[in-house]
Amino acid sequence: MKMHQIPTPTMSQVIMLNDSITTAEFMVSALRDFFDKPLEEAQKLMLSIHRDGDGVCGVYPYEIAIYKAVCVRDKARARFPLRLMVQEVK
């Protein structure tokens, strides 16, 4: 039987950026709904993003990171200017 080398996926982090319009409640909701953060962790991360200007929501294979970022952007688009970045982990 021939063995195939399966490539390791490129890992990427999803980074949420702070802004002055998106509510804390929306950010916590997005962190819980799309990044599976427990309430307390989501609240701490939201405060960190507010204080530091950005924060890492999670690290995923590239395609999953893009999907999660797009889902959050789509949910935010109607009411908030929330921005997310996907950045390769080196």
Curated annotation (Swiss-Prot):
Disulfide links within the chain: none
SUPFAM superfamilies: ClpS-like (SSF54736)
InterPro entries according to UniProt: ClpS, ClpS_core, Ribosomal_bL12_C/ClpS-like
One Gene Ontology biological process: proteolysis
Pfam families: ClpS
Domain of life: Bacteria
Family designation: Belongs to the ClpS family.
Subunit architecture: Binds to the N-terminal domain of the chaperone ClpA.
Entry function: Involved in the modulation of the specificity of the ClpAP-mediated ATP-dependent protein degradation.
HAMAP family the UniProt entry points to: ClpS
Protein name: ATP-dependent Clp protease adapter protein ClpS
Originating species: Helicobacter pylori (strain J99 / ATCC 700824)
